[in-house]
């Protein structure tokens, strides 16, 4: 496995790394979130994943993240070791087994330990903390529904997810802006999501299931996708009518809708208007 290579420094601070890294999983397989935290610090990373790994990391000078969940009688040991350029750093924490969302808490703690190690080693502090691939507003709305006030929620997000003060302010502002719209939703209403899983190029930070259509072989398949998408819209409209649902909003995305040609996009929007009653949509 290749050693890490620093590409860019500024004021003696590492800005960009390119390297191969192995992530080892012992006692769990929280790939998505652990990999997501790594990408906060190393956007150009290349991963190898080893599941059912040994409880101890390998000898040698490879770059790795080694994660452990060791469940004991009453407690679970959570341990993260990171090796970069031959230097390893370890953090660990134990949690009680008797937890309502045991797996979620194990995953969260492992991500916090990993974040703290990389924050110290790399010298940057991603302002959304360990939140990756999730809309913070959804968390705020969920916690409000449990009866928590905003002060309690902010303290919880700061302590448990390491979200910075400026991002907390933004998240609460967004939640407050959305709340009147959510309250105004009608009974039996639904939102239509029209998936266009194509882009003209793929962004390095993207976590969506989308494909760059940069070759003729790929673009040749788009017409067929549009044809089948229109059939799916017709079937979805039939179900909506049977269930007496009212269309509230339409979202076209996925991908990048304008990756389709103007004619292809027109075909999709025509199908939406043909099969659905859009008169009451916002």
Regions found by a protein language model. Name each.
Residues 63-98:
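Amphipathic beta-strand/beta-sheet edge segments enriched in Tyr/Trp
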Residues 188-226:
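Canonical Radical SAM [4Fe-4S] cluster-binding loop centered on the CxxxCxxC motif
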Residues 231-282:
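Conserved SAM/AdoMet-binding glycine-rich loop
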Residues 122-125, 145-192, 243:
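N-terminal [4Fe-4S]-dependent radical SAM core
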Residues 95-106, 110-114:
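Extended acidic/polar, glycine-enriched regions
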Residues 20-62:
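Short Lys/Arg-enriched alpha/beta "domain-start" segment
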